[in-house]
C-alpha cells in the first residue's frame, strides 16, 4: 500500500481551530460567533508523503483519482465518472495577439458533465457515501447542480436541487435528466434557506454552501480542485506557472487550486508558487483587496451574462488565496466576457461558457494595462463549455442566411455576411 496523507480534521482558515466532526458544513463556529463567516478546510498531515518523488504520488488510477493519496477520502471507494486528466492547451494564436507567448488554457469542459465541478462532486459524493448520507442536496444555477445530480445518480442516492427561475433552460434540463428533483426559487437567499432546513432537519448532505453570507462549498469537495494544480504541475515537468487565472464567485475553485499549489510546494515537488488571479463580474474580492479588508463585503450586484459567477458576495477563502499568493482580482464586464468567448472560439477552437471566458477577459484586461510580463507562463482555467448556455452567444452571431441557388450568389453571401472573399 502506498503512503497517503492523513486527515487530521476540519481546520478554520482564520482562527486555525481544528474540528473532528466530519459533517460540519456551516463553517467555523468560533468565527461565526464573532460575526465572521469563514469556511473550513480539510487539515492533512503530509508527513507520510515527504521524501517521495512526484511520479510516485500519482497512482495507477486514471484522472483525478491518480492523486488519491492527497485526497481526504479512500480512492478504492471513489465515486467516479472518469473526471480529471483534462488537457492543458497552449493558446498560440491568442497569445501571439496579446503578446503573451506562454498563454495556456486548462480545459475543464472535457470532464464528464462538461465542467470542473465534477472534481468537487466526485470527492464530495465519495465522502457522502463514506458517512452514510441518504439524500444529497445543492443550491445551483447549473454546472454544480448538474454535476451533483450525475454523481448522485452514480451511487443511487436521491438528489434535491434548489435553482433559480432565471437559470438557463439547458441547465435545468441537465439537472433533471440525471434524475434530480429540481425546484426553482425566486432568489439565491430563498433557496439557501430551504436547503438549510433539509440539512438541519433531515440530515441531507450538501455539496454546495447554504449560508448567508456565503462561505463556500463542502470542504471535502473543494479538495478535488487541488488536482488541477497537480495536473498542471505534472504537465510542466513538476514546475509551476507564474500566474493562474480562475473565474470566481464563492472561490471554491480558486482556493482549492491554490491549496494544491501549496501542498506541491510543501512536498518539495515545485520550487515556486504561482500568483492567483480572480476574474469576477462584480468584484467583491477586488474591492476587499483595494480597501485592505480582512473579510470581503457585499458589493453592488446585478445581471451578468456570466451567470455562474454573478455574485455580489466574496468569501474569506477566496481572499485568503489571493493574499497568500500575492494575487489580485479583476472586475470584468459583459462586453469583455463576450469578446473573450468569441476570441476563444474563433482563434483557438474552444467554446467556453461566458463564466469560463471570464478568465480570458481578465487576461486581456491586464495585458492591455501592461500588467503582465510577456515572458510569464499564464494558465487560465476554462471551467465549463459554452454548450451549457448557447443562447448567451447569440449577440455576437449573425443570423444564418439562406443559401442562394447559384454559386456566384453563394460567394456574394459569404462575402457580405461572413466577410469571406473566396472568389479568387
What are these regions (language model features)?
Residues 1-424:
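PLP-dependent amino-acid enzyme catalytic core
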Amino acid at each position: 500500500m502506498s503512503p497517503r496523507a492523513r486527515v487530521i480534521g476540519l481546520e478554520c482558515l482564520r482562527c486555525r481551530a481544528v474540528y473532528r466532526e466530519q459533517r460540519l458544513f456551516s463553517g467555523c463556529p468560533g468565527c461565526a460567533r464573532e460575526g465572521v463567516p469563514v469556511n473550513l478546510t480539510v487539515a492533512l498531515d503530509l508527513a507520510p508523503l515527504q521524501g517521495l518523488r512526484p511520479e510516485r504520488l500519482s497512482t495507477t488510477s486514471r484522472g483525478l483519482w491518480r492523486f488519491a493519496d492527497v485526497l481526504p477520502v479512500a480512492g478504492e471507494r471513489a465515486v467516479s465518472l472518469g473526471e480529471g486528466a483534462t488537457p492543458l492547451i497552449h493558446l498560440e494564436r491568442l497569445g501571439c495577439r496579446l503578446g503573451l507567448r506562454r498563454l495556456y488554457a486548462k480545459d475543464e469542459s472535457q470532464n464528464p458533465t462538461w465542467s470542473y465541478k465534477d472534481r468537487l462532486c466526485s470527492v464530495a459524493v465519495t465522502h457522502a457515501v463514506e458517512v452514510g448520507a441518504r439524500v444529497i442536496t445543492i443550491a445551483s444555477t447549473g454546472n454544480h447542480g448538474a454535476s451533483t445530480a450525475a454523481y448522485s445518480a452514480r451511487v443511487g442516492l436521491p438528489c434535491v436541487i434548489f435553482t433559480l427561475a432565471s437559470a438557463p433552460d439547458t441547465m435545468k434540463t441537465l439537472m433533471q435528466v440525471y434524475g434530480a428533483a429540481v425546484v426553482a426559487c425566486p432568489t439565491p437567499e430563498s433557496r439557501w434557506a430551504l436547503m438549510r432546513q433539509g440539512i438541519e432537519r433531515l440530515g441531507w448532505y450538501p455539496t454546495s454552501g447554504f449560508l448567508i453570507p456565503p462561505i463556500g462549498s463542502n470542504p471535502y469537495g473543494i479538495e478535488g480542485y487541488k488536482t488541477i494544480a497537480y495536473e498542471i504541475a505534472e504537465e510542466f515537468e513538476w514546475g509551476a506557472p507564474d500566474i493562474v487565472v480562475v473565474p470566481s464567485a464563492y472561490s471554491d475553485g480558486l482556493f482549492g487550486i491554490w491549496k494544491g499549489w501549496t501542498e506541491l510546494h510543501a512536498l518539495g515537488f515545485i520550487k515556486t508558487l504561482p500568483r492567483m488571479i480572480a476574474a469576477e463580474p462584480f468584484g467583491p474580492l477586488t474591492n476587499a483587496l483595494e480597501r485592505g479588508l480582512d473579510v470581503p463585503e457585499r458589493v453592488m450586484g446585478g445581471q451578468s451574462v456570466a451567470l455562474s459567477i454573478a455574485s455580489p458576495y466574496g468569501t474569506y477563502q477566496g481572499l485568503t488565496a489571493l493574499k497568500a499568493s500575492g494575487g489580485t482580482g479583476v472586475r470584468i464586464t459583459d462586453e469583455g466576457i463576450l469578446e473573450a468567448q468569441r476570441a476563444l472560439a474563433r482563434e483557438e477552437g474552444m467554446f467556453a461558457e461566458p463564466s469560463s471566458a471570464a478568465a480570458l477577459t481578465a487576461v486581456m484586461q491586464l495585458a492591455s494595462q501592461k500588467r503582465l510580463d510577456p515572458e510569464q507562463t499564464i494558465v487560465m482555467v476554462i471551467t465549463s463549455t459554452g454548450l451549457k448556455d448557447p443562447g448567451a452567444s447569440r449577440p455576437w452571431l449573425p443570423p444564418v442566411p439562406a443559401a442562394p441557388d447559384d454559386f456566384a450568389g453563394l460567394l456574394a453571401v459569404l462575402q457580405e455576411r461572413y466577410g469571406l472573399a473566396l472568389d479568387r
